[in-house]
Amino acid sequence: MLSSTADHLFWMARYIERAENSARMLDIHLQSSLLAGGRSESQRNQSAQAVLLISELVPAFEQSQKNQSKTNPKTQNEHISDAVLRFMVSDPNNSSSIYSALYSARENARAVRGAITTELWETINVTWLKLQARLENDAWMQDMPAFFDWVKHLSLIHISEPTRPY
């Protein structure tokens, strides 16, 4: 019983950390592509491919693109950079996406609901609900730097919540 609780707590924290790391990497990719406004589309695509290589997700991305083109023809004309961002942020089939990481963190927290503080559970649950609202209709793409800052900030809240003096 104790090892099961410890396991869920470990993975809850690990998935929150994974979401933060993904947000940092994607934010750097976004900033570098914005700073180099004169870059060609092929250079932006190479930068997006580098994100996939770092994450070891090239085959998963290619499979996702094949599936997307069958189910949603409007994504065929999407720039590779936007497709990579969407894949890394909101694809529920990508176990490394921010969506999947925060979903898994919430599920692990829910499994040990009695072992964590009410405040921590509420923070994780509200984070999940707000994430769903931001991902709806790709609203997060309207202000990506703010979205990535939000994810990074949330990971700090999760780290500091258990140590906060009451």
Where are the predicted features?
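Alpha-helical transmembrane segments and their helix-helix packing motifs
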Residues: 1-156, 160, 164
